[in-house]
């Protein structure tokens, strides 16, 4: 919420409008929205096999109130890592691990956390990623720099184990299957 408030104060605009006008529209992310419950026709979210009633996140601007598609998230991730959204200096700070994390998973390591991005490796490839969740939904948006590839997973069931899905999908995504 702090980032949302900072954006609103610095820009003089509501957070949702600022993101839409300055990031979403210029990148052509037409299937992405900010604030409110998931837009129609979003898949229904589930927890323990039961539907979850969506709620309006607009009052908590900057805290998971962005709804998107895999294609839009992949486009956003590529634009971010190409330096099209922030300065190279800011991108470097974002991707530099400021908080080390120890992880013993061989296929999917996490080595640290930068400013909003986890750092690590996927199947031996350096990677940066950010997971997300809302009641009934999970998300994962990753970037593999040496392949210039985005990897996005969206789930409408809280029981999905993203690392397990990544292990299954990585070989195909990396062209190794």
Task: For the regions a language model picked out, list residue spans one by one.
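Short, low-complexity, polar/charged sequence segments that are solvent-exposed and flexible
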Residues: 87, 135-136, 147-149, 170-175
């Amino acid at each position: 919420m702090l980032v949302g408030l900072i954006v609103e104060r610095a820009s003089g605009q509501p957070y949702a409008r600022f993101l839409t006008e300055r990031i979403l529209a210029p990148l052509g992310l037409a299937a992405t929205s900010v604030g409110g419950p998931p837009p129609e026709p979003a898949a229904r979210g589930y927890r323990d096999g039961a539907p979850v009633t969506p709620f309006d996140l607009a009052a908590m601007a900057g805290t998971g109130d962005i709804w998107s598609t895999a294609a839009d998230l992949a486009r956003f991730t590529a634009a971010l890592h190409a330096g099209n959204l922030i300065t190279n200096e800011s991108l470097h700070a974002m991707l530099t691990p400021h908080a080390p994390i120890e992880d013993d998973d061989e296929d999917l390591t996490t080595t640290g956390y930068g400013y909003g991005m986890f750092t690590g490796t996927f199947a031996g490839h350096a990677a940066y990623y950010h997971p997300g969740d809302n009641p009934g939904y999970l998300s994962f948006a990753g970037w593999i720099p040496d392949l210039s590839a985005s990897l996005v997973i969206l789930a409408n069931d809280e029981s999905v184990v993203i690392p397990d899905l990544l292990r299954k999908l990585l070989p195909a995504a990396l062209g190794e299957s």
